Design a protein with these regions (language model features):
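Rhodanese-like catalytic fold shared by cysteine-dependent sulfurtransferases
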Residues: 4, 16-30, 57-142
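Flexible, polar/low-complexity N-terminal or interdomain linker segments that lie immediately upstream
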Residues: 7-58
Length: 142
């Protein structure tokens, strides 16, 4: 009976993991906020495109696309990316809520991968833009 319970638990665990959707980014594609803030402060962003895929462009120098869970904003992102070289470093962020709940970062990052961008990054804001950027006094758009 004990073995049957263990096997049932393993099967349930495997099934639930298979049902969970994988994030479209790798850990190596997460950019630390301190690194981006340093690059902005030291004016080392000439080769970098920073894109907000959430409700507001807060990070200094970022382009406001709008929430990409909305199809029209995802299409706006697609159009914005048309003239950007595929090897250009692109950092996207949202920050509306914790990563696990964010409706915007997954479709936007998946689009970057679909379009073949080789140097795409996701700004690592695991909690939200306030906690992980604003409260640290990192550079913002005026």
């Amino acid at each position: 009976m004990k073995y049957l319970f263990i096997i049932a638990c393993l099967v349930c665990s495997i099934f639930s993991q298979a049902q969970q959707k994988q994030d479209p980014w790798k850990d190596s594609q997460l950019m630390d906020p301190a690194l981006l803030a340093s690059r902005i402060e030291n004016q080392k962003t000439n080769d970098l495109v920073i894109i907000s895929v959430g409700p507001e462009a807060i990070v200094k120098g970022s382009v406001d696309i709008g929430p990409t869970h909305e199809p029209e904003n995802l299409e706006k992102l697609r159009n914005y990316l048309k003239d950007i070289p595929k090897n250009r470093e692109i950092v996207i962020y949202c920050g509306c809520c914790p990563f696990v709940k964010c409706p915007n970062i997954r479709p936007a990052f998946a689009l970057l991968m679909e379009l073949g961008f080789k140097n795409a990054k996701l700004l690592n804001l695991p909690k939200n833009i306030k906690t992980d950027w604003l409260d640290k006094n990192y550079p913002t758009n005026d």
